[in-house]
UniProtKB/Swiss-Prot annotation:
Residues 96-181 are cytoplasmic. Residues 1-22 form the signal peptide. The lineage of its organism: Eukaryota, Metazoa, Chordata, Craniata, Vertebrata. It is found in: Membrane. The chain crosses the membrane at residues 75-95. This is Transmembrane protein 154. It comes from Mus musculus (Mouse).
């Protein structure tokens, strides 16, 4: 940053120096005489400083161009890529909703649904027949069947575990201590 500032100060100094050199009449009145050698040396110095200043300004412009390029890359990374990702996501959602609405809606299956119709296939035709209450078991009937199964399994397992069965518990069996007395 100091090189561009120094180049700018040098360029301004040269500009003011040339404007004061343009007044030859003032230099004659001041009592100073400029010889041609001093004048040519002065011009050589000015041209050398001008080329150095131009090179410094060119470097400054090149570094600004590099900064602009990096700013463009940052802009692309920070704005353009997330925006493109958002557009792709939106496009995918729209396609999914389009295909979902285009697909024919299927009838829910009779199992687990509250549908009052049951499908039967006769030949090549499918008929929808209403489900009547006597055709479906109630919750209580299902629970009773499960309880019966459990009780039967308990009776079978009782023989192996040395637990008294229901029949043994119901029979009045005198205890051995009662027989001795």
């Amino acid at each position: 940053m100091t090189v561009p500032c120094a180049a700018l100060v040098l360029a301004l100094g040269l500009a003011f120096g040339q404007s004061s050199q343009g007044n030859d009449e003032e230099s004659e009145y001041s009592g100073q005489s400029i010889t041609e050698e001093e004048n040519s040396e002065d011009e050589t110095t000015r041209s050398a400083l001008a080329t150095v200043t131009t090179e410094a300004l060119a470097e400054n412009v090149n570094s600004t161009h590099t900064n602009d390029t990096s700013n463009q890359v940052e802009f692309i990374l920070m704005v353009a890529i997330p925006l493109a990702a958002l557009l792709i996501l939106l496009f995918m959602v729209l396609i999914a909703t389009y295909f979902k609405s285009k697909r024919p809606k299927q009838e829910p299956s009779s199992q687990g649904s509250q549908s009052a119709l049951q499908t039967h296939e006769l030949g090549g035709e499918t008929l929808k027949v209403p489900i009547f209450e006597e055709d479906t078991p109630s919750v209580m009937e299902i629970e009773m069947e499960e309880l019966d199964k459990w009780m039967n399994s308990m009776n079978r397992n009782a023989d192996y575990e040395c637990l008294p069965t229901l029949k043994e518990e119901k029979e009045p069996n005198p205890s051995p201590s009662d027989n001795e007395s």
